[in-house]
Amino acid sequence: EVKQESLSGITEGEAKEFHKIFTSSILVFFGVAAFAHLLVWIWRPWVPGPNGYS
């Protein structure tokens, strides 16, 4: 069996660990961003009503 070396130089276990940390941090980032957008929408909706923002 010929062992193929990775292009990045990290092992498969290290790659899986990195992937787990990366995906969880992306989910946290998107969660914070979605919450911030919700707060801004509550404060001032992007589509004003018939009377504008008054």
Curated annotation (Swiss-Prot):
Major localisation: membrane
CC per GO annotation: plasma membrane; plasma membrane light-harvesting complex
Domain of life: Bacteria
Residues in compartment: Periplasmic: 44-54
Membrane-related topology note: Single-pass type II membrane protein
Keyword terms of this UniProt record: Antenna complex, Bacteriochlorophyll, Cell inner membrane, Cell membrane, Chlorophyll, Chromophore, Light-harvesting polypeptide, Magnesium, Membrane, Metal-binding, Transmembrane, Transmembrane helix
Keyword Cell membrane annotated: yes
Cell location: Cell inner membrane
Pfam families: LHC
Residues reported to bind a bacteriochlorophyll: H19, H37
Transmembrane segments: 21-43
Quaternary structure, from the entry: The core complex is formed by different alpha and beta chains, binding bacteriochlorophyll molecules, and arranged most probably in tetrameric structures disposed around the reaction center. The non-pigmented gamma chains may constitute additional components.
NCBIfam families linked: pufB_517_ASD
Function (record text): Antenna complexes are light-harvesting systems, which transfer the excitation energy to the reaction centers.
Protein name, as recorded: Light-harvesting protein B-870 beta chain
Annotated organism of origin: Rhodospirillum rubrum
Lineage: Bacteria, Pseudomonadati, Pseudomonadota, Alphaproteobacteria, Rhodospirillales
